[in-house]
Amino acid sequence: MAYNKESKQRRFLFAIDLDGTLLADSANGTVHPKTEEAIKKAVAQGHIVSIITGRPWRSTLPVYEKLGLNAIVGNYNGAHIHNPADPFFIPAITYLDLNEVLYILGDEKVKKEITNYAIEGPDWVQLMHRDPNLERVFGFNQATKFRECINLEKIPLKPTGIVFDVKPDTDVLELLTYLKRRYGDLGEFSSWSKGEGLSPVFDITSIGIDKGKVISLIMRYYNIDIDDTVAMGDSYNDLSMYNVANVCVSPANAEPLIKKMSTVVMKQTNKEGAVGYFIDHS
């Protein structure tokens, strides 16, 4: 169905996180059949289904195409907002100050928790050392310019984001809280799952960037009423969406804090098609 701003049909906006929510398996990028069926049906009915994720576009593209999506996408938690299906939509890219990021990463409390990190822009990546799990989620090897090892002399001064892995025993919430309190004037910090049994990933984006702001833009662009907005997520980087959307849905595998903030907590996990079951019964 073609998008029509003047349409009188009641349409919903489903703003959906990828890892731990829409995807049944982050490593393989698989989608539960129930979720795939429900999303395709919603799109065919004219509803807006938007992916808002910490991933870059290169590792979001296969999912976007598989589901037949046609709406705005938010990558890097909103640092890159674009619509691959609309050549007339002007993309928005927000960059980080590299010097400020390196200052944050040099903090002893932060540095001792980091096991690997990557600095990246829309078409380039520098990764400290190879890691198949991290590379599968972020599609680093698909970047136009990929470099193993961080060469500070050859990094553009304006990356879009930084991602870093932490130790398996890192207290995620404690570190996230520390980053926000200590460096909240320099950037936005979030943490999310990159797959079952794997350590969480942290990311840093420019100040003022979060998923909730992407929802605000999307609802205005498509003329969606606030009452008809639904956010679906499982981790800490999804909380900003919950502050904007009218209905907040989490799968059974979501972090306890996310469940506490949710309007609806599904019985199913992401692996069991939680997103599909909710949309199908909306």
Curated annotation (Swiss-Prot):
Active-site feature positions: D17 (nucleophile)
EC number per UniProt: 3.1.3.-
Family annotation (PROSITE patterns): COF_1, COF_2
Residues that, per the record, bind phosphate: L18, T53, G54, K211, N237
Reported cofactor(s): Mg(2+)
Any one GO MF annotation of this record: phosphatase activity
Hydrolase listed as a keyword: yes
Record GO cellular component, one term: cytosol
InterPro entries: Cof, HAD-like_sf, HAD-SF_hydro_IIB, HAD_sf
Binding site for Mg(2+): D17, D19, D234, S235
Keywords annotated in UniProt: Hydrolase, Magnesium, Metal-binding
Pfam families, alphabetized: Hydrolase_3
Source species, domain of life: Bacteria
Family note: Belongs to the HAD-like hydrolase superfamily. Cof family.
Protein name (database record): Putative phosphatase in upp 3'region
Species for this entry: Metamycoplasma hominis
